[in-house]
Amino acid sequence: MPIDGYSSLTQLGRQAGVPANPDEAVIETFANPHPGTNYTVRLTAPELTTICPITGQPDFATLIVDYVPRDRLVESKSFKLFLGSFRNLGTFHEDCTAYIHKRLSDALDAAFLRVVGLWNARGGITIDCVVQTGELPSNCALLPLGRTDYRTGRI
């Protein structure tokens, strides 16, 4: 497959630093090479880090994004840098998960979008947040939710 149509990407293949905050981050997208074909894309970030806005203590999550693209796909380096910009941000788990969903929704206009934040326990309580929009096409499947063991590939 020829590599063309990616000239609008400004971060992939170039030196790019982590933005100071998520509002400054740009989530880049590129043309879906298979428009009209329903398929599910999963992005998993096992090391999302934020700061508790009250205590200043770090919070950690596995972020799972499932989407069925229409015309655009997420460029993964820009998404990684976007997520890195949360490292020093004071935010609650629910707000962070919903904000990531909004930014992806604005960037993609996906047929289906689900963002799941599986937050590590704090004070003995885990918080799992799910924000979902659109209908999953009947010919698409979702992998089970859960933390994947990246060494074995098992959930």
From Swiss-Prot:
NADP keyword on record: yes
Record-given protein name: NADPH-dependent 7-cyano-7-deazaguanine reductase
Classification lineage: Bacteria, Pseudomonadati, Thermodesulfobacteriota, Syntrophobacteria, Syntrophobacterales
A GO term from the CC aspect: cytoplasm
Pfam families in the record: QueF (PF14489)
Localization in the cell: Cytoplasm
Pathway membership: tRNA modification; tRNA-queuosine biosynthesis
Keyword Oxidoreductase: yes
EC category name: oxidoreductase
Organism listed in the record: Syntrophobacter fumaroxidans (strain DSM 10017 / MPOB)
